[in-house]
Amino acid sequence: METSASATASEKQEAKSGILEAAGFPDPGKKASPLVVAAAAAAAVAAQGVPQHLLPPFHAPLPIDMRHQEGRYHYEPHSVHGVHGPPALSGSPVISDISLIRLSPHPAGPGESPFNAPHPYVNPHMEHYLRSVHSSPTLSMISAARGLSPADVAQEHLKERGLFGLPAPGTTPSDYYHQMTLVAGHPAPYGDLLMQSGGAASAPHLHDYLNPVDVSRFSSPRVTPRLSRKRALSISPLSDASLDLQRMIRTSPNSLVAYINNSRSSSAASGSYGHLSAGALSPAFTFPHPINPVAYQQILSQQRGLGSAFGHTPPLIQPSPTFLAQQPMALTSINATPTQLSSSSNCLSDTNQNKQSSESAVSSTVNPVAIHKRSKVKTEPEGLRPASPLALTQGQVSGHGSCGCALPLSQEQLADLKEDLDRDDCKQEAEVVIYETNCHWEDCTKEYDTQEQLVHHINNEHIHGEKKEFVCRWQACTREQKPFKAQYMLVVHMRRHTGEKPHKCTFEGCSKAYSRLENLKTHLRSHTGEKPYVCEHEGCNKAFSNASDRAKHQNRTHSNEKPYICKIPGCTKRYTDPSSLRKHVKTVHGPDAHVTKKQRNDVHLRTPLLKENGDSEAGTEPGGPESTEASSTSQAVEDCLHVRAIKTESSGLCQSSPGAQSSCSSEPSPLGSAPNNDSGVEMPGTGPGSLGDLTALDDTPPGADTSALAAPSAGGLQLRKHMTTMHRFEQLKKEKLKSLKDSCSWAGPTPHTRNTKLPPLPGSGSILENFSGSGGGGPAGLLPNPRLSELSASEVTMLSQLQERRDSSTSTVSSAYTVSRRSSGISPYFSSRRSSEASPLGAGRPHNASSADSYDPISTDASRRSSEASQCSGGSGLLNLTPAQQYSLRAKYAAATGGPPPTPLPGLERMSLRTRLALLDAPERTLPAGCPRPLGPRRGSDGPTYGHGHAGAAPAFPHEAPGGGARRASDPVRRPDALSLPRVQRFHSTHNVNPGPLPPCADRRGLRLQSHPSTDGGLARGAYSPRPPSISENVAMEAVAAGVDGAGPEADLGLPEDDLVLPDDVVQYIKAHASGALDEGTGQVYPTESTGFSDNPRLPSPGLHGQRRMVAADSNVGPSAPMLGGCQLGFGAPSSLNKNNMPVQWNEVSSGTVDALASQVKPPPFPQGNLAVVQQKPAFGQYPGYSPQGLQASPGGLDSTQPHLQPRSGAPSQGIPRVNYMQQLRQPVAGSQCPGMTTTMSPHACYGQVHPQLSPSTISGALNQFPQSCSNMPAKPGHLGHPQQTEVAPDPTTMGNRHRELGVPDSALAGVPPPHPVQSYPQQSHHLAASMSQEGYHQVPSLLPARQPGFMEPQTGPMGVATAGFGLVQPRPPLEPSPTGRHRGVRAVQQQLAYARATGHAMAAMPSSQETAEAVPKGAMGNMGSVPPQPPPQDAGGAPDHSMLYYYGQIHMYEQDGGLENLGSCQVMRSQPPQPQACQDSIQPQPLPSPGVNQVSSTVDSQLLEAPQIDFDAIMDDGDHSSLFSGALSPSLLHSLSQNSSRLTTPRNSLTLPSIPAGISNMAVGDMSSMLTSLAEESKFLNMMT
């Protein structure tokens, strides 16, 4: 890379002329590059039939693939055979001629790729040169036409020219090479032709040997992978005993080729392998005999050229005058690159030193077009070089590219060059080349003739003169006279002002000099190939010549940390390494804006909101880092459109576009050259401005990422990466910084809101902070950033691997690779951030995610990005994972891998699964209400659209709900935004699941969302599951989050909709039941609920979703006594039914309860409907139960709910209450609906007991009174309406609590003002216990009001209605048969969870209660917000609503006015008590128990068990459903299951939990869609995660 710098143009010319003369070529002007010589030699050899063994170094051209990008070149020696050259072309053919001429007599086979055919005698060098030809249009075209490989073309060309002066079969390779060198003297027609035709693409490869001039100016598809990040070792590999490397290096003016090629850069994209650059000699290129130094130099220079072809800086060889005259344009381009390099190097010198001379390279780096900077030559100042191409070429070449003139280069190239230079030379010493001869010390105006004199003067008179004071008093010194600790430090510092560089490279031909000895030592490694710094990451063997490169690599590749933050006010850039930060400061803020070490180390998080997204743009070096994806890779999440990309690119935060000369330029981030990512993760195909570029920028800047990560708010900057051009990024940076702060809209400008980049925010807590900072309360403001921040802060922090910076090798690898590679240590979500995100979107879910998002399959970043795109539909969130979600992912991973459990999040343990779910769902909730995701068609398996019966508009899934934030692809927790129906729908796999039309959802969303905009943010982000979830818990949490966030049942199950792994019988059962039971029974009830939701458009907000769901349950329970009878059966009976319908799971969940219920469970006339409801409750109860204490602990208001939940979740422990509840429910189920109601009341009473925390007596009474309450329900509708509203209002607190508790209420609460939640809760409670008496109901409200968040939580907490109405309100899933006997109950619960989540609208369609229910189940807050009401209100929607309802057994039935009635069946109830019969009908469908329905008892007990222990067997064994169920259930459910080993013991069939939407179980599992079987399944899940 420093090659040009090392040799002066004159030296090069002399060397070349000497070579040419020696070769007998008098025409120095037309020097052929060594590559040409090699090619000629090869051709000659072939023509002469040189034995194959003679030219072992010649290898067939390597196909261009990942290996090349990663620099992994495998040279397989092969025999060389004679080649028959075609008739020579006379003169310099034109492209047209070339295209018509067949260079090779051997036609390519019909199926053969003319480019991939290995050529027997293409030497490694030629391979390198020719390799790019493959990608070069010109050569490719020509060679393709002739059926030639690029090597063939070169050889043919050489042959044509009669360059067959190779030795006979006895000659040695060294002789051969020497001859080739001689041959190089001949002009190369093709080279000329290529150059003339502008076939730069191929030229870069052939130019060296075909032409005297480097063709780097020709842009090749692969030419700008970006200068290799790895310093290509010019020839260190060729340390043959007979080869005098030292001599070669010193005598070769091109010895710095490696530097020019950026061999130092570690980017795999550069195509360098370790030190070897693609252009470097192949390891196979051995010289048995001493090689002519000149020839070797020629070869090296060729390599250098190659390097440029591969994105390396072309050797700064001065083209012959002839060539210049012929190719002025080419020179301009080529020269630009060298200039760039030199200027980059200069500017990149030492940031510390760059401050002083603004005219130095820094400027040049900043301004690639025409930057005049002094020559790098330290001996004397060199006048500014002319900008003219010729001047540039000559001056630049002569000055080794030190010339400051930068010819116009593509911004990518500039960025690459800059970055490379920076890394190499400048990185070592980013000091601006200064040649000061005048003293500017204070009060000193002495002037000297030479720098030496000045230095002497300063040292003697100023430094040593002021013996005890080591202060720099140089005018305008950035240190501001801050004293140094030692004199030597001041002496070294003064070199920054004087430009003295006493440490000169001792290698011949290298003129590098450094002011710091350490920099020289590092530089010398480029000559020696020494790489003492080995990556410390286990399993990574990469070595680096300097610690900075290693640190950069480790930070980018193995972590998301960006500790180096730009301290310039208003700049939020963050970088992985100090050199990138220095480069950024110097290039973006100017050489004077020096960042001191202290400043660099002062990594306080920046306030910029963008950073909050987790990956600050700063994280993406200049430009790239700046544009670091906002908070989440999911672009969709970020903007609802862009949030999906894991690395959300917050264009707004891009202070300097990667392509822009500013920071982006300074850090030749991949933005300029998408293929070139500092982290190397970016896919080579990515173009500048593309997501990949942005991502690459994020990753590329070595320090950029770090910085970005360091500052959560910098995340927004990531969008900037998206900007196609550097300038655009600049603008975005400035504009977005403001816009990002304002809202998620920042993601809009850059669809890939990269802010979601995974860089860990300073703290996991920062996620919430970010959320709040983003606009915490508001879906719009909070959405993109909140989730991003959430993900970035906690997920990134917790799942640093998640953010794993793209690897240099990520270029071409698919996200799957990246996932496995990167997320191997993290949860599957992270593993396939992108893919998972895409899958969560599901085929049916339309999203902004573009395939580009997954551009970097290998890198998390890439995944991040693609997932971001995929998650466009999803909410906006880094990973859309709250710290709790991240924790759960980590816990899962740890459990699967047997590693130590992750450190529990603070408060995670005390949070109930619901809360965790809420947390998980929060990101979705954070989706701007205004950005409802388009509802994609449900997957075929999902059955009718959620709202098949509703307005025909597909209801948005909870994750699609405005509140839903995008989540990273690897963000399983967060299913696609509520906007996407398919996920949620999949839960039922029956139309029930399908939410109502999205528009209705949007409407409701609009209504409610407004009130609970912050619901998503608050709940999802506010609540963390206090206790660290076990793997199952994590799975459940993820599933819940996924389910909550997930769009459909599938999401609820934690499985991709179509990926939902359910036994065929279960699927059929679900479908039959869903269509039949839901349609018939639950269908009626649910439709009622749906209607209720529809009736309550205001339920639209995410909070509404949660409310709706719960309301629906509530409605079922309380709308009318009869209806409530059925509803209660749906809710109350659901408890039993849940146990029955999802016998294994539910029964296992509450063994004690199961016993009583078990017998009844088996006979579930309407248990399915009820069971579904109960299941929901169980699921949530389990969730809460899972961490019911957690719920209790986390939400104050939830306490009552938690107890409530506990009785239910903890039923095993609170077996009696649960049993009672179950029994009561069951009795109602078995008995009349009313009795069921009454019975349900008992369960509700149990819940009430829990509620008692809320308002034990009241709730208890209310619950017990609920049947009466049925009547009351109608009366309470208004009240409910208020509660709903209230529920929405409490959003922030409620959300947090709710999230903690269940996550569902949060949604409902978050979106709804706290008063509503309170009211809603009371309503729900009322619904649940209509009898609960308005008093009790009111009490609940009062209770809730006191702790509205808690209230919501209580709503959510209890599977049934929140607090008072938890039990009764519990949506009854019975209508929707669970896939298996799990019963639609479980499935319903899952569905409800997923549905509530996914179809917040369904909930919305349902009465507010339903809405609440939805919110409750899935962090419906987010979903609700996102898809507030897409209620399938009337149609099957009713059932879907119910699904939502029973999804949240706990969902509060905060029905807005008449919410009880409105609530799903509640509506029916309200409209007609008969609805209960509908409930019964829905229950009746239960007869079609899902497989293993009767097995329920142990499984159910297990689930119900509060124990955190997770039954992986049960969960995973549940297989498709189990894990889904666990997902649907809270981690507590999972724990309960595990506690009840019965679940483990219970046949996997018995574990009917599969009915729970995949989204509900951990998304990872869902996404992995293979890990739903057991602990082994869990392991499988982990494996899939990885």
Swiss-Prot record:
Pfam short name (any one): zf-C2H2
Broad class of the protein's primary localization: nucleus
Modification after translation: Phosphorylated in vitro by ULK3. Phosphorylated by DYRK2; this inhibits GLI2 transcription factor activity and promotes proteasomal degradation of GLI2. Acetylation at Lys-757 inhibits Hh target gene expression, probably by impeding entry into chromatin thus preventing promoter occupancy.
GO BP term (any one): negative regulation of transcription by RNA polymerase II
Bias type Low complexity, positions: 654-674, 809-824, 947-961
CC per GO annotation: centrosome; ciliary basal body; ciliary base; ciliary tip; cilium; cytosol; GLI-SUFU complex; nucleolus
Tissues showing expression: Expressed in breast cancers (at protein level). Isoform 1 and isoform 4 are expressed in HTLV-1-infected T-cell lines (at protein level). Isoform 1 and isoform 2 are strongly expressed in HTLV-1-infected T-cell lines. Isoform 3 and isoform 4 are weakly expressed in HTLV-1-infected T-cell lines.
Residues recorded as bearing N6-acetyllysine in the entry: 757
Region Disordered: start-end pairs: 1-22, 342-389, 577-636, 650-716, 742-879, 925-1030, 1182-1215, 1421-1441, 1469-1498
Effect of residue 932 to S: In HPE9; uncertain significance
Record SMART domains: ZnF_C2H2
Highest taxon of the lineage: Eukaryota
MF-aspect GO terms: DNA-binding transcription factor activity; DNA-binding transcription factor activity, RNA polymerase II-specific; promoter-specific chromatin binding; RNA polymerase II cis-regulatory region sequence-specific DNA binding; sequence-specific DNA binding; sequence-specific double-stranded DNA binding; zinc ion binding
Effect of residue 516 to P: In CJS; loss of DNA-binding; loss of transcription factor activity
Outcome of swapping residue 479 to G: In HPE9; uncertain significance
Bias kind Basic and acidic residues: ranges: 589-605, 968-977
First and last residues of each zinc finger (C2H2-type): 437-464, 475-497, 503-527, 533-558, 564-589
In-chain residues carrying the UniProt-annotated modification Phosphothreonine: 725
Keywords of the record: Acetylation, Activator, Cell projection, Cilium, Cytoplasm, Developmental protein, Disease variant, DNA-binding, Holoprosencephaly, Isopeptide bond, Metal-binding, Nucleus, Phosphoprotein, Repeat, Repressor, Transcription, Transcription regulation, Ubl conjugation, Zinc, Zinc-finger
UniProt modified residues of type Phosphoserine: 149, 234, 236, 242, 388, 1011
Oligomeric and partner information: Interaction with ZIC1 and ZIC2. Interacts with STK36. Interacts with SUFU; this inhibits transcriptional activation mediated by GLI2. Interacts (via C-terminal internal region) with FOXC1 (via N-terminus); this interaction is direct and increases GLI2 DNA-binding and transcriptional activity through a smoothened (SMO)-independent Hedgehog (Hh) signaling pathway.
Known function: Functions as a transcription regulator in the hedgehog (Hh) pathway. Functions as a transcriptional activator. May also function as transcriptional repressor. Requires STK36 for full transcriptional activator activity. Required for normal embryonic development.
Annotated domain remarks: The N-terminal domain confers transcriptional repressor activity, while the C-terminal domain mediates transcriptional activation.
Disease the record associates with this protein: Holoprosencephaly 9: A structural anomaly of the brain, in which the developing forebrain fails to correctly separate into right and left hemispheres. Holoprosencephaly is genetically heterogeneous and associated with several distinct facies and phenotypic variability. Holoprosencephaly type 9 is characterized by defective anterior pituitary formation and pan-hypopituitarism, with or without overt forebrain cleavage abnormalities, and holoprosencephaly-like midfacial hypoplasia. Culler-Jones syndrome: An autosomal dominant disorder with incomplete penetrance and variable expressivity, characterized by pituitary abnormalities including ectopic or non-visible posterior pituitary lobe, growth hormone deficiency, combined pituitary hormone deficiency, and, in some patients, additional features such as postaxial polydactyly, midline facial defects, and developmental delay.
Full protein name: Zinc finger protein GLI2
Lineage per the UniProt record: Eukaryota, Metazoa, Chordata, Craniata, Vertebrata
Gene: GLI2
